[in-house]
């Protein structure tokens, strides 16, 4: 049986099985070009606080659906460093009290609502944020693996049909809309999330490029996705069908996005997490080319809140906020 030390040594150099397809940059450039909403209907939320402004705004997703985001920011400051907080699978947008931890540091925080799961899978996935859904089951649904082998579909069509595609597109749309809010310091926009939110935070940081000042992700989903699916789905034999399936998954894989992240990065990996496998988290981290990056590894934690990592987040925010705090 492999010990923790040897396992960690293995993870330090693991880059994953899922490869980034050649059409990745072109595919996502097209998605971003057609997906540039502005915030609309900015209104006061039904919460009162003497020192903080609580607001909500809506924006249009690429499929025309109207989505909502929450805003919490300190009053009386013209421009603010801003964090976009993406929530985990099965979880509602975080409450105002949770968002206040960022405002207490002098940050504005924008928390987009994740669109609801279909009723058919809602019961199964509603506790995914607690680590009660396996990485294999999450991958099977969000990549729509049952339909990826349709012979008539191209790689791009396969990827666009997956539920994960729309969530990544939504996350970028929220970030684009956030950039044009009048209080946002465009030079200090960061992303953060856990699980599904961690994947969206990394993906969005990659798509924003130089417009993202930092990204924080704890146990992100959907990295090295090919290793998460059931045996036999992507066989070792290189047939046109298997290549197409692998490329479609690669277009949505968190590790593929990681290769495009150049901003300061802070990540956490829990070695007992079965929803976000440590191999995937480390594959994503090891592919990030950013010069300033750090991974915190927690051998005895699973898919759960980690107080130590929250302390690291505070230090990260203070370090990369441009000296405003």
Ranges and model annotations:
Residues 1-52, 105, 133, 325:
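N-terminal targeting or regulatory segments adjacent to alpha/beta-hydrolase or S9 domains
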Residues 271-276, 303-304:
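Acidic catalytic loop of the alpha/beta-hydrolase fold
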Residues 33-77:
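N-terminal cap/lid segment of alpha/beta-hydrolase-fold proteins
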Residues 261, 267-269, 273:
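Short beta-strand/loop motif that positions the catalytic acidic residue
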Residues 198-246, 305:
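Hydrolase active-site cap/lid region
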Residues 283-325:
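C-terminal catalytic histidine-bearing segment of alpha/beta-hydrolase fold enzymes
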Residues 100-101, 107-169, 227-229:
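Cap/lid segment of the alpha/beta-hydrolase catalytic domain
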Residues 182-195:
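Alpha/beta-hydrolase fold nucleophile elbow
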């Amino acid at each position: 049986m492999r010990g923790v030390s040897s396992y960690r040594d293995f993870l330090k150099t693991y880059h994953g099985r899922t490869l980034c397809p050649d059409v990745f940059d072109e595919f996502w450039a097209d998605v971003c070009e057609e997906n540039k909403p502005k915030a609309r209907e900015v209104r006061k939320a039904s919460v009162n606080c003497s020192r903080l402004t609580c607001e909500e705004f809506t924006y249009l997703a690429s499929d025309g659906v109207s989505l909502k985001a929450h805003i919490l920011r300190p009053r009386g400051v013209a421009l603010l460093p801003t964090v976009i907080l993406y929530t985990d699978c099965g979880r509602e947008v975080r409450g105002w009290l949770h968002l206040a931890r960022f405002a207490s540091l002098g940050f504005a925080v924008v928390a987009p609502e994740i669109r609801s799961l279909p009723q058919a899978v809602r019961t199964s996935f509603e506790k995914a944020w607690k680590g009660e859904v396996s990485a294999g089951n999450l991958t099977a649904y969000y990549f729509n693996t049952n339909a990826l082998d349709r012979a008539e579909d191209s790689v791009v069509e396969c990827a666009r049909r997956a539920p994960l595609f729309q969530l990544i597109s939504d996350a970028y749309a929220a970030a684009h809309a956030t950039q044009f809010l009048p209080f946002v310091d465009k030079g200090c926009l960061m992303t953060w999330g856990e699980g599904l939110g961690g994947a969206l935070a990394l993906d969005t940081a990659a798509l924003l490029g130089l417009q993202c000042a930092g990204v924080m992700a704890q146990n992100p989903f959907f990295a090295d996705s090919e290793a998460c699916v059931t045996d036999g789905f992507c066989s070792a034999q290189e047939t046109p069908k298997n290549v197409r399936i692998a490329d479609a998954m690669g277009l949505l894989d968190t590790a593929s996005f990681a290769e495009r992240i150049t901003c300061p990065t802070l990540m956490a990996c829990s070695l007992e997490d079965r929803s976000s496998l440590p191999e995937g988290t480390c594959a994503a981290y090891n592919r990030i080319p950013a010069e300033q990056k750090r991974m915190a590894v927690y051998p005895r934690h699973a898919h759960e809140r980690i107080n130590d990592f929250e302390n690291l987040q505070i230090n990260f925010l203070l370090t990369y906020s441009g000296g405003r705090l």
